[in-house]
């Protein structure tokens, strides 16, 4: 876990890209975003993610869903959690880290650098420690999702040896 995302060397390529907190006023376009048919087994639908966010907040726990926008156009969705859920067999790291709970770029906007750029924006958000200080940012990916695995590793995430069901857990030191 010695790698750290080097934000000083990472420059966002899509200058209009920004995060917008998901609200009741803007969630409909986020629910319309889709991945490719081949990617559907790798990430839950945004409608499921937004329902989970609503339920998590109703329980008084921290979760922040975001629309990823290029200008006025929604191109992706992400959701950050922190001590947001507990279940039997959950990775230990999720008990003491910020978690990238969901991340997707719509199939129409993939292969344009939005994924890496959005991860940089999410990193900048997380290091403000909106729900308290942590040393780690965790995420996971379904085995076989080589695109996600490569992106996360290129950004400094490393496997920590844990699994979350069929997902490989990765961490980034903050």
Give the predicted meaning of each segment.
Residues 105, 111-125, 150, 154:
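Conserved acetyl-CoA-binding loop-helix of GNAT-fold acetyltransferases
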Residues 12-17, 21-108, 125-129, 161-164:
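Acetyl-CoA-dependent GNAT
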Residues 19, 111, 141:
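Conserved SAM-binding loop
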Residues 116, 142-161:
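Conserved active-site alpha-helix within GNAT-family acetyltransferase domains
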């Amino acid at each position: 876990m010695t790698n750290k995302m080097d934000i000083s060397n990472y420059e966002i390529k899509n200058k209009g890209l920004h995060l917008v907190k998901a609200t009741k006023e803007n969630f409909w376009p986020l629910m319309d975003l889709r991945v490719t048919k081949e990617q559907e087994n790798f990430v839950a639908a945004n409608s499921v993610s937004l329902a989970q966010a609503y339920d998590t907040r109703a329980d008084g726990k921290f979760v922040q869903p975001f629309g990823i926008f290029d200008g006025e156009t929604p191109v992706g969705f992400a959701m950050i959690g922190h001590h947001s859920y507990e279940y039997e067999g959950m990775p230990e790291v999720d008990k003491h880290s910020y978690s990238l709970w969901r991340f997707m770029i719509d199939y129409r906007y993939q292969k344009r650098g939005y994924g890496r750029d959005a991860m940089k924006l999410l990193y900048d958000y997380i290091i403000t420690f909106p729900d308290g200080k942590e040393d780690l940012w965790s995420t996971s990916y379904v085995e076989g999702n080589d695109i996600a695995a490569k992106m996360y590793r290129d950004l400094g995430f490393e496997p920590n040896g844990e699994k979350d069901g069929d997902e490989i857990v990765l961490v980034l030191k903050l």
